[in-house]
Amino acid sequence: MNMNSRNLFDRLEKEGKLKSQKADADFLNALLDAAGRNFEAALVVRGQVDEAAFKLFYDGLLQISRVVLLLNGLRPDDGEQHKTTFLVAGEILGPEYQGLIRKIQKLRVKRNLCLYDPKGLIGKSETEAMFFTAKKFWNKVRSYLEKTNPQLRLFERL
């Protein structure tokens, strides 16, 4: 972990946005299983109920990102848990993930709009963007997880 990352994590802890937490392999595998189920369900409804597919892909991304944090002894602890989770996951994963994390953060904002503003519906283009982002993110993070903890049960690539 580089010094900038450590400084960010220290700052987030002081602000009450990040806490230390250990998680065992069973818990991490349960999160990964849930992410896999969300992705499977999203693929089933994709093209039929775009908003539902979008949210399922999003939930899977969030669960995978939480695994990354927990593997590093961290968890979000604030009113912006999703934002914090993606921010910290991107920092842990490194600079080659930053473009994907920026895309996920934009999609997170769309998801919030959709959730809190019924006029902000999610359409086919947003769902496809979420699918391709989820696919790319999982395929990259899967490799990271394989190297980091061989006890994890990793589902197939999207």
Predicted regions span which residues?
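Terminal alpha-helical segments
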Residues: 1-158
